């Protein structure tokens, strides 16, 4: 039989484990959640944790993924932060392949017709395989196709298409700036930060 401790039989190790469990619970309760209308700027900080580094690249990004079911775009949200603007693409399913590059103008997928928006720079994101509609053809990313943003650098978001397993998202900026992309799971999101 063990001798009893002054704390009513609990060992120091048990107290430490209990303290760590309480801290974990408090941390989980303290995380912010955000709900925003689809395609609208968010008044609060994103629930996505901030990136470890400021955006530093202006180079094209191309990530290919094959043999997967198409992801479904459920929302695109955006918010201004102190030194950058953040665009969050909410997805159902796994993160699809994607391409991000600077373009001279946005074109409608399928028709190739120019989309009339004005800005200083245009960043085109294309997700594949992906859809922005359900099995019955109803949009899952509602509104648009042009969503005003008026943030530090990001001025508009454009749905350039949802065609043949590809979803196009145009980011209209006041000026070309460094950007970074991050993938997040649980919830599944592709996150684009663009410097001011």
Residue ranges and their predicted role:
Residues 25-28:
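C-terminal motif of bacterial Sec signal peptides marking the signal peptidase cleavage site
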Residues 30-196:
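Signal-peptide-cleaved, periplasmic/extracellular N-terminal interaction regions immediately downstream
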């Amino acid at each position: 039989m063990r001798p009893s401790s002054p704390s009513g039989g609990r060992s120091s190790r048990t107290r430490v484990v209990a303290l760590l469990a309480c801290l974990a619970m408090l941390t989980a309760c303290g995380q912010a959640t955000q709900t925003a209308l689809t395609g609208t700027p968010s008044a609060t900080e994103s629930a996505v944790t901030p990136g470890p580094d400021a955006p530093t690249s202006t180079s094209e990004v191309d990530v290919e993924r094959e043999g997967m079911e198409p992801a479904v775009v459920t929302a695109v949200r955006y918010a201004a932060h102190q030194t950058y603007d953040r665009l969050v693409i909410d997805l159902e399913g796994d993160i699809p392949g994607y391409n991000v590059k600077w373009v001279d103008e946005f074109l409608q997928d399928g028709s190739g017709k120019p989309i009339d928006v004005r800005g200083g720079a245009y960043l085109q994101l294309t997700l594949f395989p992906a859809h922005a509609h359900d099995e019955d053809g109803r949009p899952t990313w509602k509104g648009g196709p042009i969503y005003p943003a008026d943030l530090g650098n990001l001025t508009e978001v454009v749905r350039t298409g949802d065609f043949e397993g590809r979803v196009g998202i145009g980011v209209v900026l006041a000026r070309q700036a460094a950007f970074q992309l991050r993938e997040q799971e649980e919830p599944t999101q592709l996150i684009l930060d663009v410097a001011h």
